[in-house]
Design a protein with these regions (language model features):
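Structural recognition of alpha->loop->beta junctions
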Residues: 97-118, 276-285, 343-358
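Flexible glycine/acidic-rich beta-alpha junction loops that bind and position SAM and/or redox cofactors
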Residues: 95-97, 168, 205, 214-228, ...
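Acidic, low-complexity intrinsically disordered segments
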Residues: 1-203
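Residue-level signal for short, function-critical loop segments
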Residues: 9-11, 64, 212, 265, ...
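A structural preference for short, hydrophobic beta-strand core positions in alpha/beta folds
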Residues: 38-41, 86, 261, 327, ...
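Radical SAM enzyme core and accessory elements
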Residues: 2-8, 36-39, 51, 99, ...
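Alpha-helical structural signal in soluble globular domains
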Residues: 29-33, 76, 80, 97, ...
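Radical SAM [4Fe-4S] cluster-binding motif and immediate context
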Residues: 143-326, 333, 338-342, 346
């Protein structure tokens, strides 16, 4: 019985930006007596059906965006006599769909770290269960990924997870519902061992692939203190102390190490935390700005963010600590108006963001937005390729709409066009070159231009429908840029690098 793990993708670039962590974690969860699993990341290369034989087990991890491709692979694998198992956020939300459309014998709902071995045992006995509930395991149970199975020279960034869960409740995000609002944090020892393993292999750019690297805010501590909730305050301080211990040890890694993470904007009001991030080589962070207006922030349940000039000043605080921000903005909110687009572009430039992404509001399953939208769509007769809009991920990619939400004052095409104009403005050669001034050398600035253009080409898919010719052209363009760009991120292997010790052991 051969085990296959497949990460579906609609396009393959040959080179990928970041390692799909789940693939290598489940490889670690595969008992050794089954042998090393066959790993397929379709962002690199398409699945070869001929590798799948009767009696094999094929595990497919899906999110909403790649579910349709995942179902195609599942049906193919089942037709070849394999046991088909689905997991991931989307399969956890729609297990029956994976069985009906993807040929699933089984679905793992929730974390798969511990459940996967049980799935394989049942498949080996010819009796897989329809549903396995992995639940939410504790941080101490998170498995380190099997990075020894990585193909050489194919990824720009590696990925390590330090915490799962996010205490926020943004309306457009499913993380707090699927991963929970209680931070489940790995020990510093486990995180450092995995990072050192990657540095030994030549990765120096590593994403801390967390839902929120800043799980305890100063406001959280103040609130617990005002409420005289000693137990809650102690719990929060322990989580915060663990963050600082981790960053203190990350700071001992070689100086050319670069970490990138995801964080809420509230961290900008915590100079001690930002200082520790800088020392820990955390030089980049994705920050969900979402909207530049107070009304827009209320639309997405994110009114803990600031707006206007206050927003600009808060974002600049990251840069003052040498942390480069990838700002994420949403267009198409109910309160958005035509003038919102230019105002957002201006804020992105004034706030000294290094990168930015501008996405159109899409109601994803598992979110508050989706539940509200699905309710309003009851009885709507609209079908595309026979599929209702509320199951838009099942519409073939070539004709799938990019915007589903009806806006009170703007047509979908206007939102798409104005969104594209903001992408074009932020990623024009002139503006990118101006942003590159933080780099000292011409070579470095030219590399920054190339990386910026690659990011824009790979992620600025804002067409009202995904035209297959445009996708093919974009894929060729991105593939041409990806290989030379990957070399910019590569580091030299450090086989003798040791795991940094806690501060008390160094004194």
């Amino acid at each position: 019985m051969k085990v296959h793990l497949i990460n579906p993708s609609n396009v393959s670039f040959g080179t990928a930006v970041i390692t799909p962590r789940w693939l290598y974690v489940l490889a670690a969860a595969t008992p050794t007596f089954y042998g090393a699993p066959n790993l397929v990341d379709e962002t690199l290369v398409r699945t070869d059906p001929l590798t799948i034989e009767p009696g094999d087990v094929v595990g497919i991890g899906i999110h909403t965006g790649n579910a349709l491709r995942g179902y195609e692979i599942g049906r193919m694998a089942r037709s070849r006599g394999a046991y088909v198992v689905f997991g991931g956020i989307h399969a956890s939300l729609y297990p029956a769909e994976a069985a009906e459309l993807g040929g699933a014998h089984a679905v793992v709902k929730g974390d798969g770290d511990l459940a996967w071995a049980h799935v394989l045992e049942d498949c080996s006995q010819g009796a897989p269960k329809p549903l396995y509930v992995g639940g939410r395991i504790e941080g101490s149970e998170f498995l380190p990924a099997r990075w020894d199975l990585l193909p050489a020279n194919r990824y720009m960034w590696a990925s390590v997870q330090t915490v799962r869960g996010c205490p926020k409740h943004c309306s457009f995000c499913s993380v707090w519902r699927t991963d929970g609002q209680r931070p489940r944090q790995r020990s510093s020892d486990a995180v450092l061992e995995e990072i050192v393993d990657l540095r030994r292999r030549g990765f120096r750019f590593i994403a801390l692939a967390d839902d929120n690297f800043y799980p305890v805010t100063l406001t959280d501590l103040e609130l617990a203190s005002r409420q005289n909730n000693a137990a809650r305050l102690s719990e929060l301080k322990a989580i915060r102390d663990e963050r600082f211990e981790l960053m203190c040890r990350l700071a001992q890694l070689p100086a050319d190490t670069v970490f990138f993470t995801q964080i809420t904007m509230e961290a900008a009001e915590d100079p001690e935390f930002l200082t520790a991030m800088k020392a820990a080589h955390i030089h980049g962070a994705l920050v969900g700005v979402e909207s530049v207006t107070p009304e827009g922030l209320k639309d997405v349940y994110k009114d803990f963010n600031l707006a206007g000039q206050n927003l600009v000043e808060r974002l600049r605080k990251f840069r003052r600590h040498d942390i480069h921000v990838l700002g994420s903005f949403i267009f198409g909110l109910p309160s958005d108006r035509p003038e919102t687009f230019a105002a957002t572009a201006a804020v992105a430039e004034q706030a000294e963001l290094t990168f930015a992404q501008f996405v159109m509001l899409t109601p994803f399953p598992g979110t508050v937005d989706f539940a509200r939208w699905e309710q309003t769509m009851q009885g709507d007769p609209t079908r595309i390729a026979g599929v209702p809009l509320t199951r838009g991920w099942l519409i073939p990619q070539a004709i799938r709409p990019k915007l589903f939400w009806t806006h009170p004052v703007m047509a979908a095409d206007e939102i798409r066009r104005r969104t594209q104009e903001v992408w074009d403005r932020f990623y024009s050669i002139r503006v990118i070159w101006r942003r590159s001034r933080f780099l000292r050398s011409i070579k470095g600035r030219l590399a920054f231009v190339m990386i910026s253009k690659l990011y824009r080409r790979m992620y600025a898919d804002t067409g009202i429908a995904t035209d297959s010719a445009r996708v093919a052209w974009s894929t060729r363009w991105a593939r041409w840029l990806a290989k030379p760009t990957r070399s910019l991120f590569a580091g030299r292997p450090m086989p003798d690098l040791q795991v940094p010790q806690p501060a008390e052991l160094l004194s």
